[in-house]
Amino acid sequence: MLPFIAGERATGWSTSATGVLEGIKISTTPIEILQAMLESVAYRFAMVADLLLPGVKSGYQMIASGGAIQNSPWWLQTMSDVLGVPVGVSAEEQDTSRGTAILALNALGVWDGLDTHAAHIAETYEPNHERSEVYGEARERQAELYSRLLG
């Protein structure tokens, strides 16, 4: 599945991309479609992480924020499994905006506050490495689908 209901949502990517559900059968259930959608979003997050993390200092922590993911333990576990790293759940509202501002200021050299303003974590999800391997194969299939359909 390609989860681009609103196009791709990152700079330089195709804002006109559309969602794709491949391999659906008469026996496919609504919950399987929902699961595929949430997993496909996690694969895209992992691709972004692959691009960003080489530029991040060691010792980073992956933090999930936002109502949709914070209210879904299954999705949080899936995100941890797909990323292959622990995922902390923010105990604060607006942590996405806060984190973005902190990273931007840090990258610009204006503020070196990453260590002084740690996020408050309510819970941490640890990856299941067996599932991480399965999800790695699924990420490859998603990349192949993307390449075939969007170049």
What is the predicted role of each segment?
Residues 1-151:
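Glycine/Thr-rich phosphate-binding loops that ligate phosphate moieties of nucleotide
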